[in-house]
Amino acid sequence: MPQGLSRSEAQRRLKKWFEKLDILSWWDRKLEELSKGMQQKVQFVITVVHEPKLLIFDEPFSGFAPVNARLLKNEMLELRDKGHTIIYSTHNMESVEEVCDYFAIIDKSRVALSGKVDEVRRKFREGIYDVSYEGNVSLQDCERYKVISSGFQGNETYFKVSKINGTSNSQLAGELAKHGELMYFAEKLPSMNDIFVKTVGE
């Protein structure tokens, strides 16, 4: 029985979570009869059912199929948006990027890097931009940028370019616009996985 809840209230909340996680049909089953993924869902429900202000998870997405991992991420984001504080440990840096506001990378029992996710990603920016044009377009290196990669799909040409130091965003966009109609122009910030590797290695 979840602490501080009457039996009827506990059952009401549990059934609500079982419905949300699509496991209500397993309501009367014993835990040992469930698959590992189902057991993890039940463990998640038990953790959140009494609505604690602080939630702590250890590798919450480990072992889940992508669809179920996404389902749990969405539930964690909803809890966060309702004012719950969530702390979790993970080696899945993609989930850090999607879920976390703040993070800390711990290496050899010390904090190697910490801060707001968005701020740290901007701090590690490398001046890389994703660009696309309508139609078949050719780009060559120039004083404003270097071409890293290119591709063509449908009726669009895609490029990844590196901005030369001293070039402003407006100067870069202006130079790129000389070559055709820009469909997309945006800075590509490094992923949290990239930052993790740069901070502590593979």
Stretch-by-stretch model annotation:
Residues 18, 73, 121, 193-197:
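Conserved protein kinase catalytic domain
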Residues 74-160:
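ABC transporter nucleotide-binding domain
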